[in-house]
Each structure stands twice: as C-alpha cells, then as structure tokens.
Amino acid sequence: MSLPWRIRVGDAADLDAVAPLWTAVHHQHMQVMPELAPYVSDDETWRMRRALYEALLAKPDTLLLLALLDDRAVGYGLAHILDRDETWVADTWVTGPRIGEIESLSVVPELRGSGIGSQMLDRLEAHLHEQGVGDLILGALPDNTDAVRLYERRGFRPTWLYLSRFSDRRDDL
C-alpha cells in the first residue's frame, strides 16, 4: 500500500520549509501550557531554533527528515548524537559512550495521528542505531499528553523532570 506522504532526508537548505513546522510546535507549547506565558514571538523562537539546527546539521551524525504531502512539508524530525559526558545522563545511569537525542519531531496539526510521526521516529531511531548508538533521549512538555503517550508507547520513559519558576508569571499555577 502506498502512503499519501513521503519522507526524505533534508539538510540546511530545507530549513525554510521547517520554519512553519517549528512554529506549529511553538504554538502547541503555548496551547498545552498557557500558564507559562509570556512566550517569545514566532520570529524569535524560529531565529533561535534555526541557529540550533544549523549548528547540529554541521555535524556529520545529525539527521533531518522531512515528511512531504504533495511536495508540501507536513512534518520533520531531527536527531543527533551527543557524547555521554555532554548530557545529564552520565552521572546517574550507565549508558554507552554516545547518546542519541531526538531533538525535534513535528507534524502539522491536521495530520497528527496519521502515522507520519511514528514513521519518522522509526527512521530517526534506525539512523541512530546504525551509528552504533543504543541509548536515546528526547524531551516533551509534560502537558503535551499526545506526544508523551506516543513516546511511551515506543518504550521511552520519564527519567528527569525539570521544574521551572519564571519571574513575572501568573501566580495561580
């Protein structure tokens, strides 16, 4: 059976197509955790995210995937490899010398639940395993229950919880 979308490997030249997909993630963050407002602007979040992606894509083990539907980018995923000592994991758990991080995964809202995210995760995980990496980490907002459920179905478990207190936020948390 042919899927209505296709997934291809991307590079830094594809970052303009990623911008609205990252902005959708940013909006999802605002929606699921409005109590953390104010959030940075769409332009500012993309400026910072783009700089991160450019730096990661300059490394040879980073993989960017784009999901396309009729040549329109409808999702992306990005994974890279960290030395164990660059992570918060090394001083607590026994791991291999390198740890794979699923840095980002995004699917446009109208196609969430279609299998695109799972297919991209399959490919990102396979890439990391091909690089000899067996230990994986990723992050998600705790109130993004759909994402957390997807990751837990795939064997990811909560390992670390950051608690934040930002100044000048509502005090009715």
Which residues does each predicted region cover?
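Conserved acetyl-CoA-binding loop-helix of GNAT-fold acetyltransferases
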Residues: 104-107, 113-126, 130, 149, ...
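Conserved beta-strand in the GNAT
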Residues: 66, 72-80, 101, 106
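Conserved acetyl-CoA-binding loop of GNAT-fold acetyltransferases
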Residues: 151-161
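A short helix-loop-beta-strand connector motif used in the catalytic cores of GNAT acetyltransferases and
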Residues: 47-65, 84, 101
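Conserved N-terminal entry element of GNAT/NAT acetyltransferase domains
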Residues: 1-20, 24, 28, 35, ...
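Conserved acyl-donor/pantetheine-binding loop and adjacent beta-alpha core of acyl/acetyltransferases
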Residues: 78-101
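Conserved GNAT-fold acetyl-CoA-binding loop/helix
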Residues: 27-52
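Conserved beta-strand-loop-alpha-helix junction that forms the acyl-donor binding cleft
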Residues: 112, 123-124, 137-147, 164-169
